[in-house]
Regions:
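Positively charged n-region of N-terminal signal peptides that target proteins for export
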Residues: 1-4
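Bacterial N-terminal signal peptides
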Residues: 7-16
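Sec/Tat signal peptide C-region and signal peptidase I cleavage site
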Residues: 18-20
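Short glycine/threonine-rich turn/loop motifs
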Residues: 22-127, 193-290, 296-297, 317-333
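Low-complexity, flexible helical/coil segments
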Residues: 107-109, 136-141, 252-254, 300-304
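A gly/proline- and charged-residue-enriched helix-loop-helix capping module
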Residues: 132-139, 149
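C-terminal capping alpha-helices of c-type cytochrome domains
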Residues: 143-190, 280-333
């Protein structure tokens, strides 16, 4: 447990030492009005860091028994969700929250359903790796073992040197999470029919209803989320979200706020089911009616669903740059 705490502190506090990679990164062309995402203090982007993060994201080496990778919970074809109500960890313990998609996470500072302080991708990545409530990847206290595993791999030795030139102490949690965070920031999705102005008439009608019925008061902005935590009247959580305390058990007497959850993005929402914080809504319509039945009593549901489907970016779901890395180790980047 102590090792896990030290690791989380490292991910939060040592990012100022991680910004020395080559300044060779260029963001892709973004839609009009969308600025490049701000980077947390001390972080940077580079092609080498992204390549390392991509390989780590798809490698079960980051889990206790080598059975779970980040990509097992975040599946590209499903908008980087997993198609399950909640995910089972390496010890068989069931998760408590539905896995969210990852489209455009570079622009977000609220990264979990209820988090109270995990505002960077680097800090958030520590929760699935080292969290104990629930156990996901099961690496709590295994700092030295993680470094040993990665250092024993010739490809990782080379990729870490390229991503963090000048570093002499090998792989650390801080560098692992910096690389994964860099890769996740490349997961940009602005190619849906909605973005391209290619919505069919039924979807356009649904968009008007979406705005008129008040949905856009919370599902606002380019990613259809205000990033805030709201009372939505779905179901009170039975236990604290692990992200509230970095995956550690909550303090004695802690009671989670009833029924308050962060507004999820609606990007690619049609493929990220089952829906809501607990994954207990098997369809988008059931999720809508579960938390907004009164507001939408007169809505044309087929039109609203057509609009939500128009937020699906098919290119994002198949873009090979977000998929598994080549089996062979890449040459110099």
């Amino acid at each position: 447990m102590r090792g896990s705490t030290i690791a989380i502190m490292g991910a939060l506090l040592l990012t100022s030492a991680l910004g020395a990679a080559r300044p060779d990164w260029r963001w892709p062309a973004l839609p009009h009005g969308i600025a490049a995402p701000d980077l947390p203090a001390g972080t940077s982007m580079s092609a080498a860091k992204v390549a390392l993060g991509r390989r780590l994201f798809y490698d079960p080496i980051l889990s206790q028994n080598g059975s779970m990778a980040c990509a097992d919970c975040h599946v590209q074809a499903l908008g980087f969700s997993d198609g399950q109500p909640t995910h089972v960890g390496v010890t068989g313990e069931m998760g408590v929250r539905n896995v969210p998609g990852l489209a455009n996470v570079a622009w977000r500072s609220g990264l979990t359903w209820t988090e109270a302080g995990l505002t960077t991708l680097e800090a958030q990545a520590m929760v699935p790796m080292t969290g104990v409530k629930p156990v996901e990847m099961g690496m709590a206290g295994d700092d030295a073992d993680l470094a040993r595993r990665l250092s024993a791999d010739a490809c990782y030795r080379r990729l870490f040197m390229q991503a963090f030139p000048g570093a002499t102490d090998g792989p650390t949690y801080a560098r692992v999470t910096a690389a994964i965070g860099a890769f996740q920031r490349t997961m940009i999705s602005f190619g849906s029919p909605y973005d391209r102005g290619a919505m069919p008439p039924l979807a356009r009608k649904g968009a008007a209803q979406f705005a008129a019925s008040g949905c856009a008061s919370c599902h606002s902005g380019a990613d259809f989320t205000d990033g805030q935590v709201h009372y939505v009247g779905t179901a009170a959580p039975r236990e604290a979200d692990s992200s509230l305390y970095g995956g550690k058990p909550p303090p004695p007497g802690f009671e989670p706020p009833p029924e308050q959850f962060r507004t999820p993005s609606l990007r690619n929402v049609a493929v990220t089911g089952p829906w809501l914080h607990d994954g207990k809504s098997p369809s988008i319509e059931s999720a809508i009616r579960r938390h907004a039945a009164v507001q939408l009593v007169n809505v044309d549901m087929p039109a609203l669903l057509a609009f939500l489907d128009s937020l699906t970016d098919r290119e994002f779901l198949t873009n090979r740059t977000f998929g598994p890395p080549p089996a062979t180790c890449p040459a110099a980047i």
